[in-house]
Amino acid sequence: VATVDCSDYPKPACTVEYMPLCGSDNKTYGNKCNFCNAVVDSNGTLTLSHFGKC
């Protein structure tokens, strides 16, 4: 199972680095920072489906 450590998030701004992750909402996030901020916003209901685009 793919996991991402989001313990040091949320962050006020994310870089534009492109390393896509696919969330459990079937949405592609541009990088870990964008994904982890979304995880925090979802109160932990969003999880990582897999690395790469959905």
From Swiss-Prot:
GO MF annotation, one: serine-type endopeptidase inhibitor activity
Main location: secreted
InterPro entries linked to this entry: Bifunctional_prot_inhibitor, Kazal_dom, Kazal_dom_sf, Prot_inh_Kazal-m
SMART domains for the chain: KAZAL (SM00280)
Compartment(s) of residence: Secreted
Lineage start: Eukaryota, Metazoa, Chordata, Craniata, Vertebrata
UniProt entry tagged with the keyword Glycoprotein: yes
Domains: entry comment: Avian ovomucoid consists of three homologous, tandem Kazal family inhibitory domains.
Matches recorded under PROSITE patterns: KAZAL_1 (PS00282), KAZAL_2 (PS51465)
TM spans (from-to): none
Protein species of origin: Branta canadensis (Canada goose)
Intrachain disulfide bonds: C6-C36, C14-C33, C22-C54
Name of the protein this chain belongs to: Ovomucoid
Keyword annotations of the record: Disulfide bond, Glycoprotein, Protease inhibitor, Repeat, Secreted, Serine protease inhibitor
Glycosylation sites: N43
